[in-house]
Amino acid sequence: MTKNIGKITQIISAVVDVKFTNNSELPEILNALECYNDKQRIVLEVAQHIGDDTVRCIAMDSMEGLVRGVEVIDTGSPIRIPVGTETLGRIMNVVGEPIDGKGDIKSSNISSIYKPAPDFTNQSTERNILVTGIKVIDLLAPYTKGGKIGLFGGAGVGKTVLIMELINNVAKAHGGYTVFAGVGERTREGNDLYHEMIDSGVINLAEPEKSKVALVYGQMNEPPGARARVALSGLTIAESFRDMNEGQDVLFFVDNIFRFTQAGSEVSALLGRIPSAVGYQPTLATDMGELQERITSTKYGSITSVQAIYVPADDLTDPAPATSFAHLDATTVLSRQIAEFGIYPAVDPLDSNSQVLDPMIVGEEHYSVARQVQQVLQTYKSLQDIITILGMDELSEEDKLTVVRARKIQRFLSQPFHVAEVFTGAAGKFVNLADTIAGFKGLVEGKYDDLPEAAFYMVGTIDEAIEKAQTLK
């Protein structure tokens, strides 16, 4: 088979025009083309056909030093990357090349980053809770297998630690794998995350096959083409884990889904498309849908995604976050105010929510306890102005009791993490759902009104709180 060869005729930023002559066929849309710049392989992706013999492409790598006239080869297929267990413990870029300096990824399985979503007949309609072992999430905003969770939080409130604990707990409780896609990541953040994963044992350098995570990075300094496609590369690896060995439960993290949209907007502008509202690409909903619809459960396995979402100027009506909201099953909001109290994980129990917190799915007891906990916390929140101005003495006896219980609940929502053992010195706790419900049920019913507040801080189950209370006496 003769290779389809063209030549670069124009380079504008990250957009390249390639002309194919000598009766060669034009590459299909989304095909990957290859060219070499000082022995460095550069991958281009076909975005548009211009006339009879020219294609307009988006570059997946830096264009520095590339000139007109360079030969370009059509690979005959979209971008293909290595998938499977060989990717565990490794970092790769959008086109599947390793960027961790540990040699090639020797995988026999190579897969295209573009795939259709599973057929409706193959998708699972069951809504099962994915138990994370983290009390505040399991009780108040439970995750569902194959669901999509939005993780909202600013800098320094514990997003990374929460992500690493989820990776650790899901691997332990469900034996599943994790894929982390860094979309428009700061290089420093990506590097820190990698080393923290090594320190906490999520990545095992000595025996990479025992690692629990594969990483795909499209960093902030990469061209927009790479940042717009790296989430699809990560998702392709996640799909391979889901479908192997008759099904696995896979966790898929995207940080940050806003930067995926932002990169798509840059690509759209470079291709000369007329922008829509607020300057975003006209295909915003389509781009988001193509990614989100592939994140789903089949009859064999599931992909549960946790997506960090940046909200520009705190405007939830901005088209980028508003488009992603339509796809989410649960939101986990991290609060700086709660982090300042020293309560970790700093999940806001009143702002976080989940579609599966429904008596038909989680059961009547779980739903009832969760709503009672939120009611106590909401009452405490509304009383805080009175407490600040007049003090506790001005409250009725009933309100005083509510405040005491709310403060205990707040502290009981904290929990020591396995991945934080290195810097807290406290052993991490995985709490089963039944223990979580029983503990909070006892708290709202007043069974533990005689125990001091401090007994509930940074413990796992209610039994540990009772033991801690004995040592405090």
UniProtKB/Swiss-Prot annotation:
Entry keyword RNA-binding: no
PROSITE patterns to which the protein is assigned, alphabetical: ATPASE_ALPHA_BETA
Disulfide bonds: none
Native species: Rickettsia peacockii (strain Rustic)
Chain positions recorded as ATP binding sites: G153, G154, A155, G156, V157, G158, K159, T160
Identification of the protein by name: ATP synthase subunit beta
Record key words, sorted: ATP synthesis, ATP-binding, Cell inner membrane, Cell membrane, CF(1), Hydrogen ion transport, Ion transport, Membrane, Nucleotide-binding, Translocase, Transport
Enzyme superclass (EC): translocase
Enzyme Commission number(s): 7.1.2.2
Gene: atpD
GO terms of molecular function: ATP binding; ATP hydrolysis activity; proton-transporting ATP synthase activity, rotational mechanism
Reaction catalysis annotation: ATP + H2O + 4 H(+)(in) = ADP + phosphate + 5 H(+)(out)
Subcellular location: Cell inner membrane
Chief site of localization: membrane
